[in-house]
Amino acid sequence: MSETLNTPPTYAWVLKAFSSKLAGTVTKPVTKMSSYIEDAESDAELPQDAKEDLRPTETLTPLKSKAAQNGILKTPGTLQIKKTVNFKDISKDAATWNRPTKNNFLFTRLDDENPLMGHEEFKSPLLQSTPKPNINNPDNENKSKHDEFDNRYNININESYKNETKSNQRLGEDVPSKKKYPHSMDAEISKFKWDSNNNNDWSSLMKDCFRDVVNNNRKMKEIIKDVMIDTSQAFPSESLDEPDYTINLDAPRSSSGKYWKQKFSMLDSAHSDLELELTSIRERLESLILEKQEEINFWKQRCRALETEKIHNHQGQQSKYKGKEFVGNRFSQMRELYTAKPSPITTKVVSRPSQSDVREPQEQVPSKNLHRGADMSHLAAQMLTHSSKKSHTTNLIPSEGIISSTPISAASKVRMNLMQSNQTPTPAPFSIAAKKSHLPSKLSFPQDGGSLSSATTLQQLPKARVTPNVLSSLSSNLGKTNPTSVYQSKANVTTSADVEKPQVKVATSSRVDYDLKSPNQRTANAKKRLEERRRRRKLKLQELQLNS
């Protein structure tokens, strides 16, 4: 490992810097230190400028072994060189004072190239107040040097210090006119340490210099403040007197206040947008509720009208056929067929049934409780189709957008109840026993006074007991219109003595087929139709989107 460097302390470097700047730079030291020690009162020449010579000497270069010199952490070529720092002296001769762009202590001179260099009125106040040193009189050099500092910085030495120097001169103490400092650093530090007068002198100068620097800084701050106030008149909110904190959020001053004001304004705008959207949704829901309520009222009125119509029809038929054989509205043609004249028929038919087999229907007074009657679930299917068409029209409104489904309302509950129920509140025209015996709801008859058309066959007759009169009338009518149909009817009729009731196919209408279906089957068919309509609607929407 290499030896540690003998580094001087910090205060030694500061003292050396000030001493070399104010008093001059020492010459290159040599080995014989005692030969350069001079008397303080001897008239010696001023120290010359030190010449920069970086060549190492034998005394300054330490003797080290090759192992230390060839270390890994050593830079090759730097062990034989000692780097030094030289400070030049401020005291110059006449040639140096007139040298252009020469830096002196805390001030600069103008260049000789400036045409206004020779005029005193164009010089700076610092240069005008600075007198030139008297070069011809070397005894007054230090005095002129001190006067130069005093005049430049308005330095007044304390009266106590002056009186002390005068008293020392009266007592016969030797006051050196010229101060010479030894060339070594240790001797220089010891000289400053033991010379109290010199220390007081330079300490007072340093204090005054620092005081002037502080005053200049204060003046500079005031100037900057005045400039800022002048420039901030156009922007009164950014002046220096106003505080930077925010009291009112509506008029923020700080950056954080402006930031939070922007955030709160964004929240307010979002809140207002949400309120507008909520009001629009409420209006749409109210309109939908009104539409559904109108639909409910419409179907209620329709049901009431049908009930009243049924009641009036039933009461009118009872008053018309009172005291006679009861014939309903559907069986008017049956009565005419019974009363028609018979015609001869070649085929063997079953004899006419006795009067006891044909039961006379009992008259029934409409009961007050109107909760039993024929099946009217077809109204539920009509309601479903009506509501599906209406929802289809509402779903395709361009301004409102596509509505997926309506909420469960009173109308939907009414429709479900109608679909699940088997009977609606309509009056019963006759008893259940008579209905079972006659089975009149499965009959269908021609409308023109009992006469059949040419296309009608016996297969289209309802399942009922056929009398000879009925068969004769049918054969006579068929013979007049189309003779081929007569043979077809003869062939279709079974003539067996064992069978009393001929098997004839029933011609049922669409309404009768609808009544014969179960409620679950009707509900399933309605659901299928709804799904089919929805599928077609989706396809149309997709086509519209592709075209757009």
UniProtKB/Swiss-Prot annotation:
Does the record bear Disulfide bond in its keywords?
Answer: no
Q: Which regions form coiled coils?
A: 261-312, 522-548
Q: What is the effect of changing residue 71 to V?
A: In allele cut12.s11; causes inappropriate activation of plo1 kinase in interphase
Keyword Cytoplasm applies: yes
InterPro entries of this UniProt entry?
A: Cut12 (IPR021589)
Where does the UniProt annotation locate this protein?
Answer: Cytoplasm, Cytoskeleton, Microtubule organizing center, Spindle pole body
Example of a GO cellular component annotation carried by this entry: inner plaque of mitotic spindle pole body
Q: Which GO terms describe its biological process?
A: cell division; G2/M transition of mitotic cell cycle; mitotic spindle pole body insertion into the nuclear envelope; negative regulation of G2/M transition of mitotic cell cycle; positive regulation of mitotic spindle formation (spindle phase one)
Q: Where is the composition biased (Polar residues)?
A: 126-139, 344-356
Q: Where are the annotated segments for Disordered?
A: 123-182, 344-369, 510-548
Q: Where is this region: Interaction with plo1?
A: 122-325
**Ranges annotated as biased composition (Basic and acidic residues):** 140-151, 161-182
- One annotated GO molecular function: protein kinase activator activity
Q: Which UniProt keywords apply?
A: Cell cycle, Cell division, Coiled coil, Cytoplasm, Cytoskeleton, Mitosis
Predominant localisation class: cytoplasm
Q: Which domain of life is it from?
A: Eukaryota
Short name of any one Pfam family annotated for the protein: Cut12
Function field:
Required for bipolar spindle formation. May act as a regulator of the p34cdc2/cyclin B kinase. Required for full activation of the plo1 kinase. However, in cut12.1 cells at restrictive temperature the H1 kinase does rise concomitant with entry into mitosis, indicating that cut12 is not required for activation of p34cdc2/cyclin B. The cut12.s11 allele may promote cdc2-independent phosphorylation of SPB proteins thereby overcoming the requirement for cdc25 in cell cycle progression.
Subunit description: Self-associates. Interacts with plo1.
Name of the protein: Spindle pole body-associated protein cut12
